[in-house]
Design a protein with these regions (language model features):
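Short amphipathic
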Residues: 1-10
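Solvent-exposed beta-strand sheet faces enriched in polar/charged residues
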Residues: 7, 36, 64-66
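Amphipathic alpha-helical interaction surfaces in cytosolic regulatory modules
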Residues: 14-34, 41-59, 73-75
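C-terminal structural segments of small proteins and small subunits
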Residues: 52-86
Length: 86
């Protein structure tokens, strides 16, 4: 299992477009991916749950990845937030 903390840097937070792209990215991996913030958790492959987190700019997301391709999933998710979470 891997765990990574990522700060939301988008001024609009994790709104519909980047959340949808994140969920699509999570679907590319067989690993289980859980995203949590402020005591709430969401399955990374479920758009409704991810949006319900209400992650705003400055919030820290804890992302837990567990499965056979967890290293690749971790790298892809870090890259997503570094380059394209807008």
């Amino acid at each position: 299992m891997r765990s990574v903390e990522i700060k939301v840097n988008n001024i609009e937070g994790l709104h519909a477009r980047p959340a949808s792209r994140l969920v699509g990215l999570c679907h590319q991996f067989g690993s289980s991916i859980t995203i949590s913030t402020h005591g709430a958790a969401a399955v990374g492959k479920n758009i409704t749950e991810v949006l319900s987190l209400g992650a705003e700019m400055g919030n820290t997301l804890t992302i837990k990845i567990d499965g056979i391709d967890e290293a690749r999933a971790e790298k892809a998710i870090k890259d997503f937030f570094r380059t394209g979470a807008e």
